[in-house]
């Protein structure tokens, strides 16, 4: 007689388990990626060694890894904030783009005459406002009309991308560089609006991103308002019974999530890109932020090292092409990491066991004693 597996809630998972599962998820993804590379005729150890050297083997490699990680920290925070409330904001990509649009727009409007101490904060704040405004397009219907935020935020990504392309390729907007006539490109923002660099093209955006992630962690984990948010995320019915205004909390967190992604767009424009350039901004950083949040277990501080890991993977793409390995290998690894991270989250929340065997009782005929 076959015994069916029993899936039961684990309860509160230990800190060791929460650390071990993401590590094992990454290792499992590397094993699967290694099998794929071996099938295609590549030596997995050589490929992974090249990736590691490209990401951390030189000063330029470390700088490029941290540059790639900067927006991922904030798009990871954006996803983690929303998902903690069981709000499925899949629109980080569109909010990132609209943050870049708002940030570059305010930089161009202020012009080179504005001092850096005015221009840089204005650019960053404008990026957050842009992301929040774009998130509100999905947040308000979700809260007050009960619409499905997965569909609306996903569709808004493509609208934001088309809007950015229109500003540069399909119009004579202020965002388009009038000095370039051969192929349209974004107007460079003034130097006074750019983030100061301090190491091999690496700018202070990495510190701003880390500070914002820590601030989000403190807000959610250490304040009375954050406690109410966590209650809503655990049980909306319990929160309503306790007198918490659930709809208001969901709306605010949704807007904060969009603002975090918008900050990422602002830092990318004011940092390595320096303009609203669709070719440099359409990188799927909002979608990668979902992987970062999932692998971090929605922990807002764990997002930081995970974003650096993903930045290292992104940075390794060009290095792989130099040895004949397709750069799509990086995308495959990111997808494998996401799959194993989601599976790992299941095992954090649940345990699987076999049912216990019940003793079999045998009735003996009258007058017959068991041997």
Please tell me what each predicted stretch does.
Residues 2-75, 117-118, 122:
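Membrane-interfacial amphipathic/re-entrant helices at transmembrane-helix boundaries
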Residues 59, 153, 157-222, 275-276, ...:
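Transmembrane helix-bundle core of multi-pass membrane transporters
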Residues 22-37, 75-80, 100-106, 127-131, ...:
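Hydrophobic core segments of alpha-helical transmembrane domains in multi-pass membrane transport
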Residues 1-28, 34-38, 234, 241-248, ...:
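Cytosolic-side transmembrane-helix boundaries in multi-pass membrane proteins
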Residues 35-40, 50, 55-110, 124-150, ...:
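Single transmembrane alpha-helix segments in multi-pass membrane proteins
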Residues 9-20, 83-92, 113-184, 219-224, ...:
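Short loop segments and helix-boundary regions at transmembrane helix junctions
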Residues 255, 261, 265-335:
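Transmembrane alpha-helical segments in multi-pass inner-membrane proteins
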Residues 133, 199-276, 300-305, 371:
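Helix-loop-helix "hairpin" substructures at the membrane interface of multi-pass membrane proteins
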């Amino acid at each position: 007689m076959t015994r069916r597996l029993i899936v039961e809630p684990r309860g509160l998972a230990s800190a060791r388990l929460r650390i071990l599962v993401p590590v094992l998820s990454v290792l499992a993804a590397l094993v699967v990626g290694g099998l794929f590379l071996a099938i295609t005729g590549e030596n997995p150890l050589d490929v992974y060694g090249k990736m590691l050297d490209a990401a951390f083997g030189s000063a330029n490699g470390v700088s490029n890894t941290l540059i790639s990680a900067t927006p991922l920290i904030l798009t990871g925070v954006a996803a983690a904030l929303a998902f903690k409330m069981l709000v499925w904001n899949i629109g980080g990509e569109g909010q990132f783009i609209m943050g870049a649009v708002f940030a570059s727009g305010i930089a161009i409007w202020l012009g080179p005459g504005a001092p850096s101490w005015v221009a840089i904060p204005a650019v960053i704040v404008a990026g957050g406002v842009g992301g929040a405004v774009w998130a509100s397009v999905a947040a308000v219907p979700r809260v007050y009309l009960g619409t499905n935020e997965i569909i609306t935020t996903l569709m808004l990504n493509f609208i934001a991308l088309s809007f950015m392309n229109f500003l540069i390729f399909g119009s004579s907007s202020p965002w388009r560089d009038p000095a370039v006539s051969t192929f349209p490109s974004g107007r460079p923002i003034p130097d006074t609006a750019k983030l100061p660099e301090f190491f091999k093209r690496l700018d202070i955006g990495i510190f701003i991103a880390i500070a914002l992630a820590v601030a989000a962690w403190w807000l959610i984990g250490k304040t009375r308002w954050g406690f109410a948010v966590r209650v809503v995320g655990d049980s909306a019915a319990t929160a309503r019974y306790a007198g918490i205004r659930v709809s208001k909390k969901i709306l605010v967190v949704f807007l904060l999530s969009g603002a975090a992604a918008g900050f990422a767009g602002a830092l990318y424009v004011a940092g390595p890109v320096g303009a609203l350039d669709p070719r440099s901004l359409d990188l799927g950083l909002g979608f990668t932020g979902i992987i970062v949040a999932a692998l971090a277990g929605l922990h807002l501080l764990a997002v930081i090292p995970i974003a650096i890991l993903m930045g290292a993977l992104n940075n390794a793409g060009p290095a792989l092409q130099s040895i004949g390995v397709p750069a799509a290998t990086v995308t495959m690894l990111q997808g494998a990491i996401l799959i194993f991270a989601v599976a790992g989250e299941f095992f954090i929340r649940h345990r699987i066991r076999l049912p216990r065997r019940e003793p079999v009782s045998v009735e003996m005929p009258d007058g017959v004693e068991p041997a």
